[in-house]
């Protein structure tokens, strides 16, 4: 027969093996999933805004809402409210004066609603929720709640297309183009029409004057000097003699 010590050790080993088998067969607790909506909110001043955090999975405790002001330079978020999952206990942050800016409620066992009573610059920023399950803290995605920017768009001005005339036909001139102004009394064409007439004429006159000056300069330089004095004839002996006149 086995001794009492041997039987005690065998029993402990058997119990230890069963506990290991049972522990390995148990499934690990599933991490909760946080869904928050809407994903983004563009609100107007004074508007009421509802933010919903839906918790999928088992949560031992409640849900907390946190807030990061858009104008704040501090990186850490601010606690807003805590809602318990088992009873209707709601805890606000007294420093933030959350009870006047916000209101909260637990819609169902897994939906926690945070309401912005009146949207203002004081509660403009980024919101997210958080839960604790099995001593682990989980966070949702961030929802930006910002002021809506009203973009002013100007209507495009529609211009009537000008009629297209066939090729080779003269376009009739509108009477208001060369009509004298009502407040100015004068004779002849208007200044707007005078400049279109005299400017080309003045340009042509200047071009002709420059051409004439250039022509005179070139002609003066190209003239050759002709010597009319007779040259003396050279004799074969090397002495010059007077040139003979040709009749």
From Swiss-Prot:
Post-translational modification as stated in the protein's UniProt record? Palmitoylated, but association with CD8B seems to be more important for the enrichment of CdD8A in lipid rafts. Phosphorylated in cytotoxic T-lymphocytes (CTLs) following activation.
Phenotype of null mutants: Cd8a-deficient mice prevent the development of class I MHC restricted cytotoxic T-cells. However, maturation of class II MHC restricted T-helper cells seems to be unaffected by the absence of Cd8a.
Topology check: give the Cytoplasmic ranges.
Answer: 218-247
* Protein's cellular compartments: Cell membrane
Per the record, its GO cellular-component terms are: cell surface; external side of plasma membrane; plasma membrane; receptor complex
The segments annotated as topological domain Extracellular are 28-196
Q: According to the UniProt record, where is the region Disordered?
A: 156-182
Name under which the protein is recorded: T-cell surface glycoprotein CD8 alpha chain
């Amino acid at each position: 027969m086995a001794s009492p010590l041997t039987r005690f050790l065998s029993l402990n080993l058997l119990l230890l093996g069963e506990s290991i088998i049972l522990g390995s067969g148990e499934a690990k607790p599933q991490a909760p999933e946080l869904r928050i909506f809407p994903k983004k909110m563009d609100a107007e001043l004074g508007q009421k805004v509802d933010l919903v955090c839906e918790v999928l999975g088992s949560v031992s405790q409640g849900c907390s809402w946190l807030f990061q002001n858009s104008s704040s330079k501090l990186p850490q978020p601010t606690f807003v409210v805590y809602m318990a999952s088992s009873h209707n206990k709601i805890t606000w942050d007294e420093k933030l004066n959350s009870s006047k800016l916000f209101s909260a409620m637990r819609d169902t066992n897994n939906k926690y609603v945070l309401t912005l009573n009146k949207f203002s610059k004081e509660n403009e920023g980024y919101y997210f929720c958080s839960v604790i399950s099995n001593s682990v803290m989980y966070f949702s995605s961030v929802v930006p709640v910002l002021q809506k920017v009203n973009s002013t768009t100007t209507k495009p001005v529609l211009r009537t297309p000008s009629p297209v005339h066939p090729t080779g036909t003269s376009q009739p001139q509108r009477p208001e183009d060369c009509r004298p102004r009502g407040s100015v009394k004068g004779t002849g064409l208007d200044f707007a029409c005078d400049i279109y007439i005299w400017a080309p004429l003045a340009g042509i006159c200047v071009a002709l004057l420059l051409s004439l000056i250039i022509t005179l300069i070139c002609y003066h330089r190209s003239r050759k000097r002709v010597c009319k004095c007779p040259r003396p004839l050279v004799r074969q002996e090397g002495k010059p003699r007077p040139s003979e006149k040709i009749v």
